[in-house]
Amino acid sequence: MLKLPKRKLRIGRARYGVICNPQGGIIDDALVYRLGEERYLLVPNASNKDVVLDWFHRWAPGQDLVRIEDITSKYAMVAHQGPQAMAMLEELAPMDLSSLRPFASVETQVAGVDTLLARTGYTGEDGMEVILPASQGPDL
């Protein structure tokens, strides 16, 4: 269903993968974040979210190993990238963000707001994906 490289995904890491149908056709690509021992976050393309969610709901019933929760409306995601992105975020975050390797993530605060920061952008520029409560998005 979700094809990822064989390596185990460690807590605090993300991996890029593809969501496939039984014939191997690609439904979407997505990032998978491992947030805890049994806690993962899947971020598909926003324009394809409903298709991906329907796909997972179709295949997950009867499998006690997984619980799917659509949290899309509860969170905002901002790709903060460019030559000054890291320096700007470091002024607002209580940590040295340069220590985060590509595809690393950390739950921390930015300007006092609980966020998930992830070095997972793939626009060609360095930076962070910032995931935070939707109600806090405009203020940040």
Predicted regions and their residues:
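Basic, glycine/lysine-rich polyanion-binding surfaces/domains
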Residues: 1-140
